A protein has these predicted regions:
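Extracytosolic ligand-binding ectodomains
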Residues: 1-141
């Protein structure tokens, strides 16, 4: 599956989906200092049983990337912000380092995880470097 995150597993029950694979850029179980800090703060705010999926982490990134882009643009003007967005880097992202491409999508790593009975994902594979975003690939039209 490519659309089941920790959020959905919470409702389905980890024991009911154990062993399924998911391709995401973020799993709550990622072992890096940024993610550990993020998960700890999230659980302190929303409770120890709360989970964080790829979509939640992406929602967290948005305001930070917007802030950095507005600061670079020196303006809230949408055209100036859009023009300033390429090459904005977020080194403290829970998923790890990300960067905005000139097409306004993120360079990020891709990961494959296997679901565990506790509702988390075991990291099985990770791209060795950031993947260039291609939101409109030729040949799919």
């Amino acid at each position: 599956t490519i659309s089941v995150t920790e959020d959905e597993v919470l409702g389905i029950g980890g024991e009911n989906i154990q062993g399924f694979y998911a391709a995401m850029k973020y799993f709550q179980s990622l072992d890096n200092p940024n993610n550990k800090k993020f998960v700890e703060a999230f659980k302190a705010k929303y409770g120890p049983k709360s989970v964080i999926g790829d979509v939640t982490q992406a929602a967290y990134l948005g305001p930070w990337l917007w802030k950095m882009t507005v600061e670079k643009a020196g303006s809230f003007d949408v055209d100036k912000v859009a023009a300033a967005s390429p090459d904005i880097e977020f080194k403290e992202a829970p998923e790890g380092y990300v960067k905005i491409h000139k097409n306004h999508h993120l360079w990020s790593k891709t990961r494959i995880g296997q679901s565990l009975p506790d509702g988390q994902f075991k990291l099985i594979a990770e791209s060795p470097k950031l993947i260039e975003p291609d939101p409109f690939p030729k040949g799919y039209q």
